[in-house]
Amino acid sequence: MRPDQPLEHVALLANGLRFHAVAAGPADGPLVLLLHGFPELGRSWRHQLPALAAAGYRAVAPDLRGYGETGLTGPYDVATLTDDVAGLVRALGRERATLVGHDWGGAVAWAVAARRPELVERLVAVNCPPATALFEAMRRSRSQLRKSWYILFFQLPWLPERRMAADGAAVVARALVGGSYRRGVWPQDELDAYRAAFARPGRAKAAIGWYRAAFRQALRPRRRGRARRVSAPTLILWGARDRFLDRALVEPSVLRRALAEGNVPKVVFVEDAGHFLQNEAPERVNDELVRWLGRA
């Protein structure tokens, strides 16, 4: 299969919402659920879907809540997003899945692995640290706070979504191109598809709503008690030239706080790639994914 081959488009009902997803691979293959980030869509995994399908996996990449062709209905808090993934696994007729998440999709994957371990066969996080690490880093690291300026901007009412949707969501294309270390990785037709998706009524506000919900959650006092740690085998793929996230977010000391005792992750840094790793270095990502999953 080639990345430019047509993929299946499927509709799934999960957690009371209709989800659109792109899919590839044998219906009875081991399930790999690929969760996109911001400002992306399920199609951001267009290079990985054929590679996973060719290796015998059933690969499914949904537009997440509020994105693309999926329903707009909130809320966008982590508990709801976790339930969405659980519902998607059930809607696909499975009990467990490997979760592969990039950026926000990675944050959801980390949360599902911690909160619903029975659902997660394996976890792959692509340029996304453990769930609480980013806001902790924003508190203690000026470098990360500067890189995360947009998260603070997104807390303003109405202005961020208006700017995001303006001029046919031109800022989305600029974010994808500008956030990539490698040049020429976004064909014009892909950029046009993203712009069209985020220019639709309500879509920019929904995507920014994820940040608002997470920020409100981060401001709440933490409940006392033992933190839930991830026991699923974990692979971390990281484009080292990320403009938005410091590589310190996946230092061993950070990962030890998020992972169960004895769960030693494999961490792979791709030195000549940036935040949008699966699009900047698709062959490297595909190779790492297929080889690591094949060790199961």
Regions found by a protein language model. Give the residues of each.
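Flexible "cap/lid" subdomain of the alpha/beta-hydrolase fold that forms the substrate-access gate
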Residues: 1-8, 17-19, 60, 67-100, ...
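A short, glycine- and basic residue-enriched loop/turn
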Residues: 41-42, 107, 273-274
